[in-house]
Amino acid sequence: MNSLLATPPVPPHFYEHCRLSPSRSMSSTNPSGNRKRKAEDDYLPSDHDTRMSASPSNSPAFPPRPLPASRQIKRPRPNISGRPLSLSRLLETLDTDALRSVLRSMCDRHPELATEVVHTAPRPSVSSALQVLNNYQSALHSSIPLGGNSSSDYAYNRVRQHIVNLLDALSDFTPHFLPPNESQTSTALSYLDGATEILHRLPRWDTPQNNLEKDAAYEEMAKAWILVIREAGKRGGGIQLQYGGWDEKLSKHNQTAGGKLQDAVDVLSSNLGWMGTSQDLSNNQGVDTSSIRQQLLSGTYGSGMPLKVGRW
């Protein structure tokens, strides 16, 4: 009969005490929250350590660095079209002859550029000047006809223009290496030595009239030698001429030229007369220069000299 009696209702304020708070419900899900703390728990990484050890590569505080300008890839042009080369690229395609031709034409059209080019260009050296003369010499010999008489009038007419080109270049380069334009006599002598050697290699022709150009070039070369020798004699008493062996070199050039440089040889001999030539020094190397000293030490000095008697 008691079972048929209704259960009295529970007051509403009892339901509020039965609800769990969110904090307690979350803490109840942690399995380690209901167990005792152990010693090994001190060595386990915490959530804070895990968050600090994470890589900051994706952090917004470190924006990605841009690539350097040299590594940036050029974007293709949307519309490609033909265009001329820049000046630097155009000059790279020109060889020496083409570049010389362009520069010469510019100086002809604009004369004020000629002075600028002369002051800007480096001073030509002896080797560069002799190389130009050797190029003219090679062009001359390559134009001599093969077979037959190489010193005939026909051969001369074939190479006459090359002879003119070589002699014109020789007459232009030689004053450049003469004083006062060239202050170093050693440089001037070195150029004259090489230029005279190139002049020797000009062929001799059967017709004497065809040799007038070469003979005139020898006369001009002799004047150049005389000018440099006199200038060198003013500096240090001509010591450079003495110990450079230039007397032997010039004598050899004069012999090869058939005596056409004799005037230069005479001027050199007069400048070296007071000290003797290098040949005289080489001949006197075998003489005992200490013979007077030996006579003084042995007491025989002046034994062969007559003794003067009377008042001095």
Curated annotation (Swiss-Prot):
Chief place where the protein resides: cytoplasm
Cytoplasm keyword on record: yes
Cellular localization per UniProt: Cytoplasm; Nucleus
Biological-process GO terms, alphabetical: nuclear protein quality control by the ubiquitin-proteasome system; proteasome localization; protein transport
Keywords: Cytoplasm, Nucleus, Protein transport, Transport
GO cellular component terms attached to this protein's record: cytoplasm; nuclear membrane
Region annotation (Disordered) ranges: 1-84
Top-level taxon: Eukaryota
Molecular function via GO: proteasome binding
Subunit structure: Binds the proteasome.
Function: Involved in ubiquitin-mediated protein degradation. Regulatory factor in the ubiquitin/proteasome pathway that controls the turnover of proteasome substrates. Targets proteasomes to the nucleus and facilitates the degradation of nuclear proteins.
Biased composition (Basic and acidic residues): 38-51
A UniProt-annotated Pfam family: Cut8
Protein name: Tethering factor for nuclear proteasome STS1
Signal peptide per UniProt: none
Keyword Iron attached: no
Family that this chain belongs to: Belongs to the cut8/STS1 family.
Biased composition, class Low complexity, residue ranges: 21-32
